[in-house]
Amino acid sequence: MAAPDLSTNLQEEATCAICLDYFTDPVMTDCGHNFCRECIRRCWGQPEGPYACPECREVSAQRNLRPNRPLAKMAEMARRLHPPSPVPQGVCAAHREPLTTFCGDDLSLLCPTCERSEHWAHRVRPLQEAADDLKGRLEKSLEHLRKQMEDAMLFQAQAEETCALWQKMVESQRQNVLGEFERLRRLLAEEEQQLLQKLEEEELEVLPRLREGAARLGQQSTQLAALVSELESRCQLPALGLLQDIKDALCRVQDVKLQPPAVVPMELRTVCRVPGLVETLRRFRGDITLDPDTANPELVLSEDRRSVQRGEQRQALPDSPERFDPGPCVLGQERITSGRHYWEVEVGDQTSWALGVCKETVNRKEKGELSAGNGFWILVFLGSFYNSNERAFSPLRDPPKRVGIFLDYEAGHLSFYSATDGSLLFIFPETPFSGTLRPLFSPLSSSPTPMTICRLIGVSGDTLGPQ
């Protein structure tokens, strides 16, 4: 019988005298009795003393509670050996007594022990009375909740309708995008074929004439060479031989009439113009301004640092390492190390200019070739033709009033366009850019109209203007 007695004693020692259940976080009072921390807290209730022990009624002035960890381990052991039996419905889980009343403060069911202990100062009511009162409150809550549920269902339906509408809008826009780009691809393909056809027609029209003229000149050169050789040989003959048939030789000399080739304009009538290209490039536009510290002393900059022109006389400016001298150049403030960039420059009626980009580290104090090998990628306009140190390029019939420059750093792409009609002026061979690049501007000739960097006009911003 010793084992059952030990087991029973273990259960008794591990049971709280307030809740009659195994201890949870047990604490010891000054008088040496143990209780669950939450049980004694609810039992003492009042924030100020004196505090009476629920078991021996000994009073203490302070709320001294010491954790009892060995007892906590004992309670856990008892809980494992003898798990608490399920509490029947209508029975207090703490005291195993019938639930007979209801606490209006804690909204909990009470047994007589609960009512006498921690709930002694609360509003306690009989079960039926409390049930009738709370039933009315629940019915009012149900009415409110049903209204909330109706609203929630309405909102859900609206949200689902909005979701479906949004999906339709997205799909419609997706089809619009696909359709527009397909239309644009067809348009570009048609435009490409038309330009290639025009170029081929122009080639078939002009090239045979050039070849015919070259062949005719070749025949004339052969005939002239034969006549020259004959006359040279005749000049070496003695008098009799030289004078024999001289009349025929002189007549043939007089009959020689060189026919110059027909003049063929070197400008191509067919220009490379892609519809909508400039508008697309303007998505990458940047706000470029001029750097006065780099300007040649012969150049005059506007106050807003967007315009530059050749001055009448050289200015007295500090000779800093950043300044171009003798080259009539000025750089943009912006330093480019990545990305796509586009800017437009109003050149007006200037007879000569240079535009492009250069490396930050270029030599600014010596005259030299402004080539890619020296860190310059520029297009030069000299009144009637364009050129670049990379290769020559045929000019347009009408020089542009405004030039667009597009730079794709990672792709190594630099191209120039007439911003007025979108025609291609020049494109550099693919270049692996490295280091920092700066926009370069150079009015090579004097002009009453300055070279001006175009700025964005308005807030919506699809138009560029010089001012």
From Swiss-Prot:
PTM per Swiss-Prot/TrEMBL: Autoubiquitinated upon DNA stimulation; autoubiquitination promotes interaction with SQSTM1/p62 and recruitment of AIM2 to autophagosomes.
UniProt main location, coarse: cytoplasm
Entry EC number(s): 2.3.2.27
Zinc finger region(s), B box-type: 87-127
InterPro entries: B30.2/SPRY (IPR001870), B30.2/SPRY_sf (IPR043136), Butyrophylin_SPRY (IPR003879), ConA-like_dom_sf (IPR013320), PRY (IPR006574), SPRY_dom (IPR003877), TRIM/RBCC (IPR050143), Znf_B-box (IPR000315)
Gene Ontology MF terms in the entry: protein domain specific binding; protein-macromolecule adaptor activity; ubiquitin protein ligase activity; ubiquitin-protein transferase activity; zinc ion binding
Residues covered by the B30.2/SPRY domain: 267-460
Pathway: Protein modification; protein ubiquitination
Reaction(s) the record says it catalyses: S-ubiquitinyl-[E2 ubiquitin-conjugating enzyme]-L-cysteine + [acceptor protein]-L-lysine = [E2 ubiquitin-conjugating enzyme]-L-cysteine + N(6)-ubiquitinyl-[acceptor protein]-L-lysine
Functional summary from the UniProt entry: E3 ubiquitin-protein ligase that promotes the degradation of insoluble ubiquitinated proteins, including insoluble PAX6, poly-Gln repeat expanded HTT and poly-Ala repeat expanded ARX. Mediates PAX6 ubiquitination leading to proteasomal degradation, thereby modulating cortical neurogenesis. May also inhibit PAX6 transcriptional activity, possibly in part by preventing the binding of PAX6 to its consensus sequences. May contribute to the regulation of the intracellular level of HN (humanin) or HN-containing proteins through the proteasomal degradation pathway.
Quaternary structure note: Binds cytoplasmic tail of integrin alpha-1. Interacts with the HN peptide. Interacts with PHOX2B. Interacts (when autoubiquitinated) with SQSTM1/p62; promoting AIM2 recruitment to autophagosomes. Interacts with AIM2; promoting its autophagy-dependent degradation.
Comment field on protein domains: The coiled-coil domain and the B30.2 domain are both necessary for interaction with HN and PAX6. They are also involved in MED15-binding. The B30.2 domain may be involved cellular protein quality control by promoting the degradation of insoluble ubiquitinated proteins.
Protein name as annotated: E3 ubiquitin-protein ligase TRIM11
Biological source species: Rattus norvegicus (Rat)
